[in-house]
Amino acid sequence: SIDLLLQRGDDDFSFSIPGLSRYRVSTYKQRGSLAAVIRVITFELPKPDELGIPDTVVQLSDYTKGLVLVTGPAGSGKSTTLACLVDRINSTKSDHIITLEDPLEFLHRHKKSIVSQREISIDTENYLVALRAALRQSPDVILLGEMRDYETIQTAMTAAETGHLVLSSLHTIGAANTISRIIDVFEPNQQRQIAVQLSMVLKAVVSQQLIPDTNGRMIPAFEIMVMTPAISNMIRDNKVHQIDGIIYTSAKEDMISMDNSLLGLYKAGRITSETALRYCTNPEMMRKKL
């Protein structure tokens, strides 16, 4: 990591101090000196309810195949949510779970499952190489830390299509934006085929952001989209822009828009109206509901 830092001017890595904690570090050069941002990662993964992760999100780990995406801006808790999904599978199923991460964050002990954790640039060259290799390593579940390019996305969808559960993340906000982003990565002459494939393998998109509560602590707000025949048809027919409306008006307990999630937190007295307006996607509609 030091060699990479000196060579490139920045690097990400993680390390542990026994008996204390784990740390994720982003180091970089600035004005001729070195700087670092360090985040604490506990050895023991907190329970989902302690983190404010809804049961609907945790239960996405019940899928045995397909693609589940957790999205949101940097530092919004995506890795923690994915780690909770992995931990639930590890605790309840006899599976082989392969995680591909850059860097490794939470360390998973073998419980009912076997968990193989591979760190990019240390245990393997890159995400694409590791993902292709994982398909030959008899996985039931693959955690792909990030889908960074079209080849990795294509391979991840193929893995999901061939009977594996693939969990991954993107730096997008909202289910419709996430789906559009995936399709737009590909060349125009491939987008129709990719949309059809995505409509078949995608199981759910969870978008999250951390927002301040009335006590000044950061709590998560979630948008949850689970695949339905209507949404599948919208993806296939290039009507992705209509998905937000389906989520917003959904009466299903396992589907909620970001704005309705924020409204629920406001009505519960957990956030202020100013916070709800700041983080919502439709301020005009939110003002009316507040």
Predicted regions and their residues:
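Short, flexible helix-loop junctions that flank or precede catalytic/ligand sites
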Residues: 1-290
